[in-house]
Amino acid sequence: KKKNIRFIGDPQKRIEEDYLRIIRFIRFKIMYDTKVELTTSDIIKQNLDGIKKISKERILIELLKILDIKNFLNINQNSNLKEIFTKIFPEFLYLNRLERLKKVYNQSEFNRDILLGVLLIDEKDNHEYFLHKYNASNKIKNMLEKFSKNLIKLKNDKHFFEKDLIKNAYLDGKNHLIALNLINFSINSKVKEKDFLKIFNKVLKIKVPVFPIDGEYLKQKGMKEGQSLGKVLKILEKDWINNNFKISNERIEEIIKIS
């Protein structure tokens, strides 16, 4: 039998002391999968405006803790809790996508980055509003923007997970592609589970190439330390990638001379 979860002391007083306790209360409710007393739920709803008095930084810290809880995937099963959560975080427009994510998330490591991508990204830049509202870190910003950019690429490029797979794994990493596949499946109802699994297994099996040239190699070829060395490395790497991760000694010499 599930236990009720409640505030210690008078809920109204405890909430008024620090409105962040509302979000913490939700976190514990999700973590322990416990019931919320109706009276407690009503008091929380009556005090939701108080959350506006809390700094966005403090709210974001609590939100990220919530998204780290695996039980968050079941939030749609509790209409009362879902209602409170969506009133606090109205930018999470796509909680319904969790139902598709639940079908496949066991295939890879569950993490908050995937959840943020699933719940925020759409074709209207909803994630950008979230980033601005909560003054999110550069790490979160770069992660969401990378997911958004590659979801657009994936939509427009039928070769993204096919002949360009190794190239994309080299550029963005296998973990990113695994997460991207999960997000794309959750967002796009047209993607079949068997196709998701096919891509997932392909990503797992590929061996990511290692660029064989570094600064020391170029110095041995007579180049000096400086900006030009870094520039040549980038040109060589691009040529190597575009030539199916191969480059001849003759081509290396040619690029060094041109540069």
Predicted regions and their residues:
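Conserved, surface-exposed functional patches that form binding/active-site neighborhoods
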Residues: 6, 12-13, 182-197, 213
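Divalent metal-dependent catalytic cores for phosphoryl transfer on phosphate-bearing substrates
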Residues: 99-190
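Short, mixed-charge aromatic SLiMs
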Residues: 45-58, 131-153, 202-209, 258-259
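Hydrophobic, well-ordered secondary-structure elements that form the walls
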Residues: 148, 218, 222, 243
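Glycine- and charge-enriched loop/helix tracts that form the active or gating conduit
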Residues: 1-132, 227-228, 232, 236-240, ...
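Structured, non-catalytic alpha/beta "coupling" segments that mediate domain-domain communication
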Residues: 65-88, 168-192
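C-terminal accessory/binding modules appended to enzymatic or scaffolding proteins
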Residues: 191-234
